[in-house]
Amino acid sequence: MAEMTQQQRRAPWQPSPTDPTEPTLSARALAKARGTIEDFARSYMPLLGLPVDDVLCFADSLYFVAGSLYELDELNERGGDPSQAPAAAALRQFLAGRGLLDDVQATLDVGFEYWTLERRLIAEWKRPQGDAAHEDELLRCACRASACKSFDYSVLALLVAGLTGRTVSKEMMLFLRACFQLVEIEDDLKDYRKDHEKGAFNVYAAFVRRYGVAAVTKMPLWIAEREQFYLDARAAAGLTDSQLKFHVARNESQGGAGPAMAPEACSGGWALPTPILDERLYATI
């Protein structure tokens, strides 16, 4: 990773004179951010060449950014447009004050794309099924949404790198995003019934809507493609032997996500829930 010069580098704990001063975050959003930051620090900071304890040097920045994203996510769930929210403006102002907005903007845009896709899919899933072409398009949108969903982790990776004067390579970011998506897939499988009841986005639900009971054979084919992408990206990311050992051990200790990431813990393969076929899907929202 390329290093910034000492003159360019800002201490991670230094505030910016342009930091936002108006309150834009709820306690609820900050509480949600806590688990994300802990998992990010323990699972991914060592892959960026940073000790886990270094999170304390810029915890305020991580909490503000992650909390802002959760605030926007809650607005999206209420049907609002996150891109125009005060929390979005404050987040951009915060990043710009640290010279990081240009580095992070494209990844923030992925988040706004995810929220747009999520709103569209939830609305479409309330309606009766359409013809095959229409349903195929919805499934493609759901797969794209799955790839975008963990954009918050990508934002945190770029934030930590920027605050510590590092540049994350394209290959490393592709690898991290592949990791993030497999974890999201595992979460969607575990949360399938709960998400069905809540009317929340779930990529497995998208496969069930399109294929019915055959989703249990169709979705593993798609997951296998994602796992191969992960393995290829991992090979190209330039991990040291110690980083690779850490990464696999962390995956095993977490019990997932899937045999490509945790060969021993997931030796039995992916566990897909029984599809819910009544397809009153999301009609209670």
Where are these regions (language model features)?
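Flexible helix-coil transition and linker loops at the boundaries of alpha-helical arrays
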Residues: 50-51, 234
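P-loop/Walker A phosphate-binding loop and immediately adjacent motor/lid segment at beta-alpha junctions
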Residues: 9, 15-24, 28-31, 207-208, ...
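All-alpha helical catalytic cores of prenyl diphosphate-utilizing isoprenoid enzymes
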Residues: 23-47, 54-68, 75-196, 243-248, ...
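Active-site/pore-lining binding-face segments in mid-to-C-terminal subdomains
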Residues: 170-245
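C-terminal domain/tail detector
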Residues: 1-23, 92-99, 225-285
